Amino acid sequence: MTPTVTVQLTDDTAKRFEGHAKLLAIGTATPTNWVDQATYPDFYFRITNSEHLLEHKEKFRRICNKSKIRKRHLVLTEELLKENPNLCTYNDASLNTRQDILVSEVPKLGKEAAMKAIKEWGRPISEITHLVFCTTSGVDMPGADFQLTKLLGLNSSVKRLMMYQQGCNAGAAMLRLVKGLAENNKGARVLVVCSGITINIFRGPSLEQDDNLLAQCLFGDGSAAMIDGKDPRPGLETPLFELVSSAQTIVPNTDSHLKLHLREMGLTFHCSRAVPSVLAENVEDCLVKAFEPYGISDWNSIFWVFHPGGNAIVDRVEERSGLGPERLRASRDVLSEYGNLTSACVLFILDEMRKKSKKDE
């Protein structure tokens, strides 16, 4: 005889699963140092002692001109590069140098964004119950989450989660993760911090690796933080966005198109030219699966927080999805002003969206 087990939710447990997580505050930060994209090719080839590679320099200039990026903020300065010449070659062993810088700077930049989010939230820092930290810049133990806990003075009992090496996927992954944490832990207030610094991928040019030039043109440094929770307290907390649902999809046979590998020379970047087309050809299937349950099929009727992996990606997705120019405006603006900020990019765009909404009210 097969036993029968009946499970009944108590009133308290049932209430825990009611309602959606809300985004309660956002903060962003960038290094004070920034580079002008129009003149960056001259700086890059000079600082890497590669000015003799005239054709390669002109190729890099064309890539920068087509990027639609106006400027990027970088921790790397000319002084820092002169002090560490092994960062300026293509393949010299330099992982220790990069790690020494990143382990210190990533949590510091994350703190700046976190403090802004906490200030906007307006509640005591002691009410933060969970901390999630994400970066693709360096690896260390104790991790950047532990270092940030000390920098902010969080409770020693805060529940921490450290996520390394998520790349550009991290922004959406953080939203998915924080939704689960906020909705399944009564009274939770989750601080999420994404901090990225490109020292791990900066290197001199290589005649054999053109995708390295794309990496040197595309990525910028920045951090973003958000505070999430369920059941905002009236008069004390102001919800900005509601996290209704989340999903993730793997497109088969695409794992070779975009790869990053940690080596003695740092983090190497390899990107296929097919990436914009692959994304554009598959985005609609993802949209249908996500929005069909809600009866939505007009992609111009929703607001887009689209990670701008690069200008070509934004163009192809906009064209293939039949979007009007305003749908991806916030993504284009963030790309123009900061470059690709990897994990922090989505939160920068959310911040841009809410600022625009306030202006339009």
UniProtKB/Swiss-Prot annotation:
PANTHER family per the UniProt record, alphabetical: CHALCONE SYNTHASE, HYDROXYMETHYLGLUTARYL-COA SYNTHASE
EC number: 2.3.1.74
Associated pathway: Secondary metabolite biosynthesis; flavonoid biosynthesis
Family designation: Belongs to the thiolase-like superfamily. Chalcone/stilbene synthases family.
Active site feature: 168
Pfam families found in the cross-reference section: Chal_sti_synt_C, Chal_sti_synt_N
Protein name per the record: Chalcone synthase A
GO terms, molecular function: naringenin-chalcone synthase activity
Keywords, alphabetical: Acyltransferase, Flavonoid biosynthesis, Transferase
GO biological process: flavonoid biosynthetic process; polyketide biosynthetic process
Enzyme class: transferase
Cited CDD domains: CHS_like
Organism lineage: Eukaryota, Viridiplantae, Streptophyta, Embryophyta, Tracheophyta
Protein purpose: The primary product of this enzyme is 4,2',4',6'-tetrahydroxychalcone (also termed naringenin-chalcone or chalcone) which can under specific conditions spontaneously isomerize into naringenin.
Catalyses which reaction(s): (E)-4-coumaroyl-CoA + 3 malonyl-CoA + 3 H(+) = 2',4,4',6'-tetrahydroxychalcone + 3 CO2 + 4 CoA
